[in-house]
Amino acid sequence: MDLSNLKPAEGSVRKNSKRIGRGEGSGKGGTATRGHKGAKSRSGYSKKIGFEGGQMPLQRRVPKFGFTNRNRKVYQGINLDTLQNLVDEGRIKDTVDMDVLVENGLAGRNELVKILGRGELKAKLKISVHKFTASAKEAIEAAGGEVVTL
């Protein structure tokens, strides 16, 4: 092996591709691989998104339906098992109101809250929030707690 017969490893060197549109001498001048005439050969050409060659596009063939209710109220759901975990950790004492929920990161200051019935509640709590499911209300009262709707 000499310096005269060294060559790079197989596949380690890539031949640079020809740059298009750089004069006839480059081998890719003239039409620069775009063919002759027509919209696709012009600068600035791009197909419109959803264009189907003049056929009525899908988004116009499919009918409109439904609407968005602007007056919809969105409630932040909190389950009973979440409240029970906080009681077990000592982060909730005997009353649960918006201040306590915000403090513990369960709801935002301006959010509406709904207590949901998943899990089991053993603690006797006075809970005052915006809404309760029937099963949650039952479980809270069965544990000796109190339900207050804001």
Swiss-Prot record:
CC per GO annotation: cytosolic large ribosomal subunit
Recorded superkingdom: Bacteria
GO function terms (MF aspect): rRNA binding; structural constituent of ribosome
One BP term from GO: translation
Family matches, as InterPro entries: Ribosomal_uL15 (IPR030878), Ribosomal_uL15/eL18 (IPR021131), Ribosomal_uL15/eL18_sf (IPR036227), Ribosomal_uL15_bac-type (IPR005749), Ribosomal_uL15_CS (IPR001196)
Biased composition (Gly residues): 23-32
Homology family: Belongs to the universal ribosomal protein uL15 family.
Functional summary from the UniProt entry: Binds to the 23S rRNA.
NCBIfam families associated with the record: rplO_bact (TIGR01071)
Record text on subunit structure and interactions: Part of the 50S ribosomal subunit.
HAMAP family: Ribosomal_uL15 (MF_01341)
Designated name of the protein: Large ribosomal subunit protein uL15
Organism lineage: Bacteria, Pseudomonadati, Bacteroidota, Flavobacteriia, Flavobacteriales
